Amino acid sequence: MKIINTNNADFKQEFENILARAKTDIKEVSSIVTSIIDEIVEDGNEALKNHIEKFDKWEVKSDEELQISKDDMKKAYENIDEKLKEALHIAYDRIKTYHEKQLPKSWIDFEKNGTILGQKVTPVDRAGLYIPGGKAAYPSSLLMNAIPAIVAGVEEIVVCTPTPNNEVNELLLAACHICGIEKAFKVGGASAVAAMAYGTETIPKVDVITGPGNIFVATAKKLVFGEVHIDMIAGPSEIGILADSTAKPKYLAIDLLSQAEHDEMASSIMITVDEEVAKQTSIEVENYLQTLSREEIARKSIEDRGAIIVASSMDEAIELMNEIAPEHLEVMTANSFELLPKIKHAGAIFLGENTPEPIGDYIAGPNHTLPTGSTAKFYSPLNVENFLKKSSIINFSKQAIDELGEACALLADTEGLTAHAKSVRVRLEDN
């Protein structure tokens, strides 16, 4: 694994290259995705069937075949191993408990002059969840997307997942059963996003679409934004690690690889203040690579998008990591909590050597749907508020409009909005 020192003459350029590699360019697939969306809008279910036959390699003979039945979900749940059931329920309970703490409250404030101001928090009516599918389906993604919607109080949750060769992952169906999902469809890719955004004869139009996916899914979400709300536009997985001399290289190495094995495009960056830790971690990465079932993918990721940076101080290391703004950030230092106030940008922050990133993927409780590509500078993890909206509440008494009305009318006058001003003054005249 390549080691870069911040004292290198060309470090600035090397670091800019690292940042550039983390970006996802969707331009190359935009025209393809636009065509897919147009076909769904124009032809609905017929286009869905054609896309499934083309991309997932099975023939849909009726509209009914697009939907996954609740009976299938229940049977899948009953068929899985008891220990897996227990693990899914543990994850469900922990995720739900965490997200319940995020719920904002409606509020009302009464002023002395009789003004009543407030905020009303309301869930969206219908949420669409995109869940990657096929044999390598991720039931954890279903839990992480469905539970915040459930906690928010969304009345109708729609799930779309691809089913290559008409195969649906049993664990994913079991997770659907645990979450009480009633509408799930065998539709994937940009087609699924378009179907949920615009609706078809079978798939209802939703208000918000969340969930991870490949570049086609990400592009589709970007293109339908405005027709519906979306959570974020996520790219390949990322991990950043801050380490000092106390960090164990074997922990650092396997944690870097935990993201590298996801995808050849995944990014794994460690910044340390200890050159010996950097060298030993690089050696451990190579040792672990040879033991992985997805060695080829992980090796390509580490070679193309992995790096160990040796910084001159922890402050410099944190400054660089804030610039990277990684999806996942592990802090393996002697004083991880003391560094927390200085960390500004990361999707999720894992403190201490006993908190590897996979803990957050499955069982800790916080959401694992996180911003990538440095968008943690302005995006948050998926949360309950993605499924909520807020309305302002305003009520003026006679006394309140008498006190504040003329100021309001004057501001309207300055903007040349005569009807606005008259709307207030006609009431002042009556009073």
Segments predicted by a language model, with ranges:
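N-terminal Rossmann-like NAD(P)+-binding subdomain of aldehyde/semialdehyde dehydrogenases
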Residues: 1-125
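Short acidic-hydrophobic, aromatic-tinged amphipathic segments that line or gate anion-handling sites
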Residues: 2-7, 183-188, 308-313
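Conserved small-residue-rich beta-alpha loop and adjacent elements
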Residues: 109-174
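Conserved NAD(P)+-binding/catalytic subdomain of aldehyde/semialdehyde dehydrogenases
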Residues: 180-251, 255-267
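C-terminal core of ALDH-fold dehydrogenases
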Residues: 323-431
